[in-house]
Amino acid sequence: MPARPASSTTRQGALAEDRALAYLQRQGLVAVERNYRCKGGEIDLIMRAADDTLVFVEVRKRGGRGFGGAAASITLTKQRRVLRAASHYLATLDRLPPCRVDVVALDPGRLEWLRNAFDLGALDSEGGGEGPAS
């Protein structure tokens, strides 16, 4: 059976990730992995900074700036998924490097790099659960 063509949303997301990756590389970060997935989470980009910090990057794109723009679209549930995937990835390493979670937010005509966008320590306080269903 032939593979289904990627949806417009999937293509737009991949283009946003390409743009974020190129931008971060120009800033001196080195790509480690792209689209890391595990049960319960995913990370768009994993990068390494010059100081050896491992940087987990969530890329968000919005077609308009309504409702707070791309950065504001990162829900608590999405943060938990990124943190879960980061924890899973870190468990595969022999040594734990310094790490942080950044966001690259793409709005029309604007790219914003938010360093330390949310705290990896939140994993410890959340207990890994999703919380009550809404």
Curated annotation (Swiss-Prot):
Q: Where are the transmembrane segments?
A: none
Q: Which residues form the signal peptide?
A: none
Name the Gene Ontology molecular function terms of this record. Answer: nucleic acid binding
**Pfam families hit by this protein:** UPF0102
Q: Which SUPFAM superfamilies match?
A: Restriction endonuclease-like
Return the InterPro entries for the record. Answer: Restrct_endonuc-II-like (IPR011335), tRNA_endonuc-like_dom_sf (IPR011856), UPF0102_YraN-like (IPR003509)
For this chain, the family text in UniProt reads:
Belongs to the UPF0102 family.
This protein's name? UPF0102 protein Rmet_3430
Q: Which organism is it from?
A: Cupriavidus metallidurans (strain ATCC 43123 / DSM 2839 / NBRC 102507 / CH34)
